[in-house]
């Protein structure tokens, strides 16, 4: 079944077969203009899908100044704010919402350190990025941030809840 879903869809604690608990979360990921221009969007998206994360929202966006300022509002007044806005408005980007067990932490680990020179090999930034100002990807850093950012980039009707047969093989049976 496919339906529109709210940005805040979190299933709570779900026991997995090993007896530990996972939390199904949603998180925002942006493939920034450098990732789009370098034609890495598909490779980056594939890494998340290969890990078992589910795409529930995806679009190519030409970012205007207003959207950039809303996204970077926490940095308003900082010396690098204008540089952030200029970069994110310089070319289209890919915005997506990913869903999965502990998605926020998993995505942050997969993305790697903000400074590509400090990012571990095997991470997106460690493998593909060179310069901090052009580090390919933005990923929400906490649940509250994810909820806010998803609301900035996506309307509720742009997010689609659906079940995948593969979920039982990726995350196991889920207690509702």
Where are the predicted features?
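Non-catalytic terminal and connector segments of soluble metabolic enzymes
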Residues: 2-6, 10-176
């Amino acid at each position: 079944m496919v339906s529109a879903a709210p940005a805040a869809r979190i299933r709570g604690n779900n026991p997995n077969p090993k007896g530990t608990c996972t939390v199904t979360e949603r998180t925002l990921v942006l493939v920034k203009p450098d990732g789009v221009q370098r034609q890495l969007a598909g490779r980056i998206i594939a890494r998340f899908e290969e890990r078992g994360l589910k795409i529930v929202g995806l679009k190519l966006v030409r970012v205007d100044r207003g959207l950039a300022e809303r996204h970077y509002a926490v940095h308003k007044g900082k010396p690098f704010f204008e540089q952030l806005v200029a970069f994110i408005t310089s070319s289209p980007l890919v915005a997506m919402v990913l869903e999965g067990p502990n998605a926020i932490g998993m995505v942050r680990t997969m993305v790697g350190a903000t400074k590509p020179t400090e990012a571990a090999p095997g991470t997106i930034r460690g493998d593909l990025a060179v310069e901090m100002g052009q580090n390919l990807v933005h990923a929400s850093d906490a649940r509250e941030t994810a909820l806010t950012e998803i609301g900035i980039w996506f309307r509720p009707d742009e997010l689609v809840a659906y079940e995948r047969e593969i979920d039982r093989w990726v995350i196991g049976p889920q207690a509702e």
